[in-house]
């Protein structure tokens, strides 16, 4: 039996025990450390002015499951990663000089990290660490310590939260108002861990003799200047910021032997594409977002709205017609209570917006909305916002308590009226240790689970316990990291006992050209044993993400994260500071031969072997606003898929080229 061969349940229990113990141990950890790491450069050139693109705002591009690549942090080469810089690491011969806002030159080297990503590209991703870098530190240790404390408290961005350009801009504005700050900017970097980002605040201090509180910052923006050079900022002052949103994408996609060359068995409709199918997709998302303070109080209100137009030109692998669709994408509002110097922060928002829990194992920001049928651009996946959300977030130092209500934006022909309620307790010490415990319930849903006798059980009443643990560095070894997560599912209306989880180990090689990184992940999701009275098939909920939980760009289209195990090996290199190449190998196999609830052709498996897939992703940042991405994949059907089609199958080849824009 597969469970016995691979020790799945034993591994899952280990993840559970490890995560829960970490939660209890860390809950009583002291809070003596600063909330953000700090480092001091020996010598540097002063910042002349914060970069314009270091203060981006609003809901923008979120690359879809079929095109977003896994985050991988560049490791030290000529420059060092944000979280590891110290005074001795910064060469005085390589000053961190920043160009003026009008500069068109390439971003200069800085002592924080190699690969910098646009703030809007990282929106919604978990923050692994927050780093504060003082370029011209004081010679007085006590004054320096106090400056760092005030910078961390004023910025307000904490490790463990989900990155928001809107709130990062608000925090930067607070930092720039400090009497000892000459100039400041924040930057966003990839992490060596998958699916998380690092935030760096870069600050230049005023001379010690200059300490007066600055006057109000003159308003700026297109409304004030009437000039296009201020795009996308409409209006910015000390307490307010309003920006235009303009996201978009265009791509060419080509599949050879879609549905493993046998659409009669595996395609979700009567359309049967054969041979090579090539088509184009596009989308455009204009909108508006802003934040403003209420008087001199610590209360801020914010919101955003956008409209997405998408299209598919020529037949794709789902339908024969060209189609175009437009609808509201984001429409949300909220308020933030954040008093400078107070570790207690509260944030409440509601409406159409994105949401991601942890690394997307149960809830991914790419699965909030369906992108099929009439909505067009299925591979580009431009729609990600949930139809309705209510999100609350309470933070105190290293601790975070999050509550959420979610209602996915499903297709009308397949609307299950599913609603999710959840609460999550998190500890993140900004030193590489994160422990999370989450509870999720489903108070409403018409979706059902199919049993061998034809009976159906409803998803309504489903409950999930979800612990998670992340360690970086592992055992104090630079570049070595670990992630583990587990989910136990039960239902208060009938006997259900399903489980899923993963163990993920990775290593980023230090001080080597191209900064290679390696990782291995074993993941498992239980299937239902028809001989027991308990229902055991795992429900993947809203998991997604091309290099996270789709588990194969082609295999994932015919087999989801239920009744399956997978081995995944990743190898990533970065030939230069703007270019990343990532190669993934997946091998997937089933837990049980009973697969009711899966693809109609795979309801009863004749083998545990599901298939293999190789996935190559290349990303090249043309600038802080444009990304060129290429994807290539070849999926080989396993014995179970071949036998379901009477051995009439072929490898499924996918090629994609996309250009994304985000302002």
Regions found by a protein language model. Give the residues of each.
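Extracellular/periplasmic loop regions
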Residues: 485-487, 495-574, 578-582, 589, ...
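Structural signature of outer-membrane beta-barrel domains
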Residues: 191, 249-257, 306-312, 353-357, ...
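N-terminal secretory signal peptides that target proteins for export/translocation
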Residues: 1-12
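Beta-barrel outer-membrane channel/assembly domains of diderm bacteria
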Residues: 104, 214-348, 394, 467, ...
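Signature for the C-terminal beta-barrel architecture of outer-membrane proteins
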Residues: 228-231, 342-346, 371-532, 610-614
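N-terminal periplasmic/intermembrane-space "pro-region" immediately following the signal or transit peptide
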Residues: 3, 28-300, 518
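Outer-membrane beta-barrel translocator domains and adjoining extracellular loop/strand segments
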Residues: 256-265, 312-319, 360-367, 406-420, ...
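Bacterial N-terminal signal peptides
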Residues: 15-27
